[in-house]
Amino acid sequence: MAVTIQQEPQFFTSASNPVIYTFESDETTQANFSYIVELYIDGALHSTHQVFPQSAEVAKFNASEAVRSTLASPLITNFSLTTNYDTAISTIYIIVSEKYGTPPAIQLDATSNATFVFNGALRHPDWLDFSWKDYNVSTTNILTPGVLFLTSWPRTRKAFCGLNERMFLGFISNDTSFDVRFQLFDSIGNLIVSDNVGLTFNDLTVVDCSPVTIMTNTTITAGNFAAAAYYKVRVRGTGVGIFNGSSEEFIIYIDNECHRYETRRLHWLNKFGVWDSFTFTLVSTDSTKVSSTGYNRESGVWDGTSYTYPLYQGQATTYAKTAKDTLILNSDWINEEVQKWLVRELYE
């Protein structure tokens, strides 16, 4: 007489992909048998579900639809150096109970481990290949140093950010604390300045890597950025684990080029639920299309006992207007890897 949970999601997993639990019982032959699944999100009971065996005595439960409706990834506009992105990640677990008998009654139960579900939506092949340890900044992670930030930017190409532009990098961590390091270099690779900022534990953190934000929140100055050609961003777990705990060193080149046209910096949610950015440097076109919705009423009006057709009385009546804004963005020449990245991010 027991429930056994056989399969659970990865410790960190994406909300818009299957979040699957499987479980079985040795009491499935009992009358009126079913499983009762209680889903807990951030420690509170979210919903209760009745599930029936699907493959012999085994059943499954997908928490994706329930948990993804609770998540959001708002654009960060407050110039904080780091943001605890708790709106974009939740901790979930389930309690599975047996229910059977005449009348059916709740019997024994089993509780799953906790899972961190972030506001991601991976393409199916990416989801099948996803391993949370490739992104976990933690001293308990044997894959450190070098784990990845939550972006698919092609690492063989240069990422650019202007002095007055915004750029964000996100990471997951199950460590107890970590720090963020910024290093500025000149055009021949000489270190100009370095600064570390220590932070307490967050499950999902977004670093605002914008030059203005860095200058506001660290000892790095405008003069340092004026002398720099690029800078590196690295985060490192500083907990009690035995491994290095460091992420990759993400290199950002400072875009000081004079552009003929007004540039447009586009920000969008990537597949991990974190903001990616790209600057379009050629001429952009804004347009607005106005659409009207209306009806034709019967012509003519009554004038006493006569029905007349005055010039002032129209037939076409508009009751609503809508405007659709369109922005056509044009890039300068870009590398094929970057072009493919943009197509995958924005169109597919």
Where is each model-derived feature located?
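Preference for solvent-exposed, low-hydrophobicity sequence contexts
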Residues: M1-A227, R236-E257
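Extracellular/virion structural assembly segments
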Residues: A2-T4, S16, I172, L191-L204, ...
